[in-house]
Amino acid sequence: MKQEEEKSVGLPDNAFRPLKPGEQYHPIMSPNKKYPEVNLWSVLWGIAMAVLFSAAAAYLGLKVGQVFEAAIPIAIIAVGVSGAAKRKNALGENVIIQSIGACSGVIVAGAIFTLPALYILQDKYPEMTVNFFQMFVSSLLGGILGILFLIPFRKYFVSDKHGEYPFPEATASTQVLVSGEKGGSQAKPLLFAGLIGGLYDFIVATFGWWNENFTTRVCGWGEMVAEKAKLVMKINTGAAVLGLGYIVGLKYAAIICAGSLVVWLVIVPGMALLFGDQVLNAWNPALTQTISEMSPEVIFKEYAKSIGIGGIAMAGVIGIVRSWGIIKSAVGLAAKEMGGKKVEANVIRTQKDLSMKVIAFGSIFTILLILLFFFFDVMHGNVLHSIVAILLVAGIAFLFTTVAANAIAIVGTNPVSGMTLMTLILASVVMVAVGLKGATGMVAALVMGGVVCTALSMAGGFITDLKIGYWLSLIHISEP
C-alpha cells in the first residue's frame, strides 16, 4: 500500500476537469489520515516569507502600480527548505507556509493603492493628520472582513464549480507543492533567477551602462515628434518589471502594454489634435496652458490618467453586474447551510468547516469594530457620517468580493485597483452629500477605500489558498 501511495504522487486525472455524474475527486492526501500542517516549522517559515515578500511587493507596487502574486515563489521556497531539512510528509506544512507567506502580497496591495495618498495629500493640506494607527487598523479589519465575506462563496467556487474555473495561480502553486514530494530542486531556478536579476540591476544602477527608463526623447527625431505631434514612447528596462511581466503572463502583460499604447499613441496626441487651442481646466482651475502648449507628459498627467482611472472604475461596475448570478447562487447555498440541520460530529478531516452562524456572528462583530474605528478615529464622533461610512464599506466589500474571487478563479489576477477607485469615487460623492468635506472628508474616503481594498485583496488571495487546500486535501478551518 505504501508503495502505491509513493508511486501516485501527483494530482488525479480529474483535478482540472468537471466531475462526471457520480464521480468523486480523491485528493493526494487521504481525508481519513492526519498530516502535519500547522506547527512551529510551518508558522515560522510562513511569517518569514510574509516579511520578505511584503517588502518586495510594496517596492514593486509603489514603483510600477502592480503587485505580483507571491504564492508561486513562496511555494517554490517552501519546497526547497523542506527538502533541504529532509522533512517527511511536508506537503501539508508547505501549503501552510505558502498560505501564510502569500498574505504579504494581498495585504500590501490593500494598503499601497490608497494609504500612501494620505501622505501625498498631507503635503498639500498640512492640516491633515495621518497616523500609523489608522493604516494598521484599516488593513487589519479589512483583511478579516474579506475572509469572512468570502467563506460563504467557498463551496461555490472551490467544489461546486470544480473543473470549470482554471485557477491559474492556484494550479501553478499546487503543481510546485506536489513536485516537492519528489525533491526540493524546484527552488534552484528561483535562486538562479534572483542572482541574474540582482546582477542586472546592479550593473544598471552602479555602472549606468544604460538608463532604466528608456524614452524616444533621447534622439533628435524623437524630441521633435514629442513636441510637434505629442508622441512619445517610454519603456522601463528594470529586472523587477521584467519579472513582473513573466509572473502576470504574456496575455495580461500584453493587455497592460496595449492600454499604455492606446494612452500614449492615441489619447495624448488625439487630445492635442482635437483640443489643441483650448484651455481645459474645468476640474483644475490652476491650469492656464492650452493643450498644444503642454508636453505629452503633462497631457498624460492632467487628462489621460483620469480617463484611464474612469475606465478601471467602470470595469469594476461591469464586474459586479457579471457576478450577480454568482452572488445569488452562493448566498443561496449559505442560507441553506444556516437553516439546515446540525452537522454530524464525526466527519472526515477535509469536511470540517466553520458554521454559517459563526461566520455571520464574526462578520457582524467585525463590522461593529470598523464602525467604532470610524466613529472615534476617522469621523471624530459624528454618528451620521460613521453609519453612512460603514454601510458603504460593508455593502461595497460584499458585492466586490465575488468579483475578486471570480477574477482570481478565471485569470489569476485581482482587479483590486479598479474596484478601489470605484469605492473612492462612491465614498467621496456620498460623504460630501451627507456633509463631510475638506481634509477630514479626504482622510475618511481614503481610509474607507483602504478597508475595502484590503478586504477585496484578501478575498482574492484566500480563494487561491482554499482551492489549493481542496486539491491537496487540507482542513479548511486550518488555513489562515
Region locations from a protein language model:
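N-terminal alpha-helical transmembrane segments of multi-pass membrane transport
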Residues: K2-T129, L150, R154-T174, V178-V225, ...
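Hydrophobic core segments of alpha-helical transmembrane domains in multi-pass membrane transport
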Residues: G46-A57, A75-S82, F113, S139-I151, ...
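Flexible hinge motifs at transmembrane-helix junctions and intramembrane kinks/re-entrant loops
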Residues: L62-A70, I151-P152, F207-N211, Y246-A258, ...
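Short, non-helical or kinked segments that cap or interrupt transmembrane helices
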Residues: V64-I74, E164-E169, L250-A258, A409-T423, ...
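Membrane-interface helix-loop-helix modules in multi-pass membrane proteins
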Residues: S82-H162, G245-G276, L280, P296-A315, ...
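Membrane-embedded translocation segments of transport machinery
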Residues: L368-T464, Y470-W471
